[in-house]
Amino acid sequence: MLRALARSARRQCRFSSSDAPNRVLPAPRLDYRHIAENVVYKTTNAQNRKAPIDHDAIQSVARAYTEFKTISSALNSQRNARSAVGERIRHSAKENDAPAKEAAMAEALTIKEEIARLEAELASVEETLLSLALAIPNDTHPSSPLGPESAAVELSSHGPNPIPATPTRDHVAIGRQLGLLDLESAATVTGNSWYYLTNEAALLEMALVNYALSVAIRHGFIPVMTPDVARSEIVRACGFQPRDHADQAYHLAGTSQDLVLCGTAEIPLAGMFANKIYQDTGLPLKVVGVGHAFRAEAGARGKDTHGLYRVHQFTKVELFAVTTQEQSEKMMEDMTSIQTSILSGLGFPFRVLDMPTEELGASAYRKYDMEAWMPGRGAWGEVSSLSNCTDFQARRLHIRYRGAVQPDHPSPTTFAHTLNGTAAAIPRLIVALLENGATFDDEEKLTGIALPSILRPFWVGADTKGYIQWQ
């Protein structure tokens, strides 16, 4: 039964010792004891999060952990016996006691064979244990709402009152009329859910990137330009399943490594800290990265695919932090404040939501979403999110820290906590700015776009067409 569950878990997690020759990360260090001692909570938590694991998987981890401890104890006993019989061999040789030496050597051979058997059995159980445990999602913050997306709790609202929904404010129609958006050429060149930003829309993207960067840097985040490609094992360690059909990541063909186009700059930013040990006094570490996000599933959700709202590639500014275990909850509130500051400066209505269990994915302990009002869509739309992943990613990426070093007594290492949040998802922000900022004359004819003056210092060139109004 354990082996069958492990095979199923390996198919979900895509972890196998056969990957070892090309791997850059050691095997994940998961807390099996915590899982085994909290089977009821872990099972309920997985159900609340709609985790794609077998109903008996967590109980199976507890059973496998018991088996692991039993074999480990037997193996340690045999290793102690090997040491003792080795001492007897040396003593009998010194005393020229040939019969005693021969008996001890025969016993040593038996012990050697038993150790080899136990080591093989332990390795098999450990692989089963790891494969099962990797499929278990993170714990959940006690304040997180239970249920689907509709159960999200509004924590705060910001900006002006939402203007009435109307199709005249559709961002695609506005973009086409003002020469800002070319979906037809993109469909010819690449396909559906790709786009060209032209004229002032291209300048708007650059202004938004630099504006978000400036706010993050002002709050102590170090700027980073990230790779857009990562190894699959790094992607998996961050909590994503790049070979899972639901994720539909883009994979690079014709390479000797299993490389993936990143769905978020969170992945290369997290990878920066892999296999490193930090001093606790040097934490938190805060970086802000600019990268391109690639999402192969863009065409999967009906009306969300309209225009710029859900696309295959977009520019994204990402916040990432590594903290001690005690710092992460405060860091989440600090990062929320930064995100709120960025969105408040853009002048459209938005709200902050505490996301429910079914929206947390595998890695998040708690997640906030920020949604902007988009009157052309007639709905609120996510423009930012923030997740505290506690030690979920750190245990897989081996991000650790230690306390003060004592002479002759090196302090033990502890797995760090990681947090990630969107500073700016550019196409979604452009949707919100166009749909809220469009201006019309008395006959409801489009006359231009009102943009927040906070972007003006980051604007390259002049508004040659004269339809931008800075407010």
Label each region the model flagged.
Residues M1-P162, L180:
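N-terminal alpha-helical targeting/anchoring segments
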Residues T70, S157-Q471:
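TRNA-recognition modules of translation machinery and tRNA-sensing kinases, especially anticodon-binding
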